Amino acid sequence: MNGTSPDESPDSTTQRIDSFNGEQRVYFVPLRWWKDAQDSMPSESVEKREILYTASCGSSYGGPMKLINNIFNSDILFDLRREGDALQNGETGEASVSGRDFALVSSDMWLQALKWYHDDKNTEKGVKSFSAGGVDRGDVYPVQLRLSVLQETNSLAVKICKKDNSVECFRRACKIFSLDSEQLRIWDISGQTTLFFESDVSNSKDCQQQADQEILLELQIYGLSDSIKLKESKKEDGSTQQTNGITNGMNGGTVFRFGRSNSLSFLGKAGEAGTLGLTGLQNLGNTCFMNSSLQCLAHTPKLVDFFLGEYSKEINLDNPLGMKGEIALAFGDLLRSLWAPGASTVAPRTFKAKLARFAPQFSGFNQHDSQELLAFLLDGLHEDLNRVKNKPYVEAKDGDGRPDAEVADEYWRNHVARNDSIIVDVCQGQYKSTLVCPICKKVSVMFDPFMYLSLPLPCTSMRTMDLTVMSADGSSLPIPLTVNVPKFGKFEDLHKALVTACSLPEEETLLVTEVYNNRIIRFLEEPTDSLTLIRDGDKLVVYRLKKDANNSPLIVYMHQKLEEQFISGKSSPTWKAFGIPLVSRLCDVENGSDVENLYLKLLSSFKMPTEFFTENLENPTEEEATDKTDTDGTTSVEDTNSTDVKETTESLPDPVLRLYLTDDRGNSIEAEMLKEKPVNKSKRLNVLARWPVKELDVYDTCLLSSLPEVSKSGTKRPQESVSLFKCLEAFLTEEPLGPDDMWYCPGCKEHRQAIKKLDLWRLPEILVIHLKRFSYSRFMKNKLEAYVDFPLDNLDLSSYISYKNGQTTYRYMLYAISNHYGSMGGGHYTAYVHHGGDRWYDFDDSHVHQISQEKIKTSAAYVLFYKRLVD
């Protein structure tokens, strides 16, 4: 479209038009000026339908428009509308004339109007009518449309058949952008306006399009007052550079130009800039974990190109491992919504519903792990988009001494024969797994694919624990002990550390227990249980026991003493638990008398000297006063089901020590242990000792009651730091398999705890790195807060690749981070995304704002997304 000033002479304009090699042109003219020119026309030459369209400024430009050539030089955006829809007011048919309204006229009409306007006289020359109506031409030349969303993404080619008409082209455009047809208009700007549709059933005139024609597509986002526009700011050397940013206050739609050009033009007022893809996701209720992963994937370059194209052609509806394409379609629709012009915030309800349907673990509104969602989504997208319709059977063969390169290529060919999708193309790599049998030294080499690397954090591998060690023969007092164990180790690691710390002789063994409220609540006997089951506030007691060839059962002694409590002014004697339980074996115990003698032997180390005991009769111990404030483990005398308790209280102050059979918690009394009564030695014996006041005074109960916590609460440790390369080296370090993950050795024909070694073999285009900050157990979850120092612009992995298989580069650039703040279960997820130039953005659910590059490296980094650099 060309424009000239209304004040120019018709002759000069004619000469200018002739210089365009005879091509027909369409002109924007100000509507006020056009109305004045119409007034000068002869009435028989004026037809209302000669003004086919109007053009209203779609940007926020509000200045005067005096000269047409100045208008076009300012890169102002216009919306085109039919005259009948936009210009007529009511039944009068009068046009509403505005200083910002324009008419779209043919070159013949433009020349005649200039003459009438300048000469102010009638002309004899007929006016050529210009209309979009007429006979439909149903054929077009073969044409290729190039669609692009941002300059940093590759353009998308859309093939249109020669038999396709303009209606089919219109429908194709609607399908590509997932828009309703009434929200879209197409017209030809190749030299003469011949195609103009407001619905997919409109007819067109003069559809003989040229092969190099350019189709302009306008997308109008209804219900929104703001659009996102981009402009190409001109450099001094004449080249263009795209500027990114968010611009508010612009009305109307965003115009995209599709044609043979590889670049995408976004027209807007000078100084206005914006960008696509900076769209937040609403938090539907603890869905920040999902939003974080989705934003990282939605800004993965190759995936953006793929899902903005005709990806539905690759959906595999028959894959039994897939989800009938529903996850891929839901993700594709969501990604298009995030990249739609004018979008501000998107509510991912449809996607979450699909997710909950196929992955019930993510249903509801509980907090989950963003990496677990990412793993499920990548696997689900792969299966939904798997190009392999019928997977062939392939057998995994061992290397058997063949060259690694040959075996690796064989494994990869077998993998791709069954798994071929955009996810495999972009996100999957391959590592080498070597297993060595510790017995026969058999070596097995396999090559497995990976979607992401889960790296441990080696700097936080040790944990300090405080415990109390008790003798099982009364030979020594309780001993406090501190040991260092692997933070994610097992109970057997704790046992080994205790054996070393105690210098344990061969004839002794250790029993590790957890004590709470003066009773043993747990025996830590399973060697494969995780040490994460032990919390910092727990109290652990270790008993040194003699090894017994007959494996005699244990006998556990719990203690109670009688206290006077005053309730509502009345005295109420109550039994109160105190002290650490004492443990021994039943190997030399036959009757009740032996049970009592063994108990007194275990207490012998707590007996105070005679002179201290005499002095203490006149001055009550501090421990007695302290015990009165502790009400845990109390039993009312009146509530007990022992018939001897009342006799005991009535015979004060001269009672005797009594022993009772009880349960493992010391809550109920089964029977009193009589001295001559035989003891059942077939199972563990739980004994409750009830002490008379006078006899208890001869023992130092303070030593019996003091227990340290595993780790003192409130002590703040300095934050640890580690480099990403150290994490990678820990991942690649040789280590033995666990007892629950043993390998079947083909040489020994037995399951063995083989030595395993991993090596990187083939790296993907998109490298996803998962930092293993979280550990899970049956009872608790832990998070590591260590700061991981990772490179931004140049992650060079060339020194970690076992085989250089012709790949040009092993360098990567960071483009997204999934962050987790806070503790497990109550934390919050966000995403940092690199989006054009050197800009980083913080995606915090529906809030999106720019963040400086210096602030993106934090201890909250959880999943890192890298893209391969091209040399």
From Swiss-Prot:
- Which reaction equation describes what this protein catalyses? Thiol-dependent hydrolysis of ester, thioester, amide, peptide and isopeptide bonds formed by the C-terminal Gly of ubiquitin (a 76-residue protein attached to proteins as an intracellular targeting signal)
According to its UniProt record, this protein's enzyme class is: hydrolase
Give residue ranges for domain USP.
Answer: 279-869
- Note the PROSITE patterns from the entry: USP_1, USP_2, USP_3
Residue ranges of domain DUSP in the record: 4-99
Q: Which GO terms describe its biological process?
A: protein deubiquitination; proteolysis
Q: Which domain of life is it from?
A: Eukaryota
Q: Region (Disordered): which ranges? A: 615-650
Q: Matching InterPro entries, A to Z?
A: DUSP-like_sf (IPR035927), Papain-like_cys_pep_sf (IPR038765), Peptidase_C19_UCH (IPR001394), Ub_carboxyl-term_hydrolase (IPR050185), USP_CS (IPR018200), USP_dom (IPR028889)
Q: Where is the active site?
A: C288 (nucleophile), H828 (proton acceptor)
- Give EC number(s), comma-separated: 3.4.19.12
What GO terms are given for molecular function?
Answer: cysteine-type deubiquitinase activity
Which keywords annotate this record?
A: Hydrolase, Protease, Thiol protease, Ubl conjugation pathway
Family that this chain belongs to: Belongs to the peptidase C19 family.
> What functional role does this protein have?
Recognizes and hydrolyzes the peptide bond at the C-terminal Gly of ubiquitin. Involved in the processing of poly-ubiquitin precursors as well as that of ubiquitinated proteins.
- State what protein this is by name: Ubiquitin carboxyl-terminal hydrolase 8
Question: Taxonomic classification, please?
Answer: Eukaryota, Viridiplantae, Streptophyta, Embryophyta, Tracheophyta
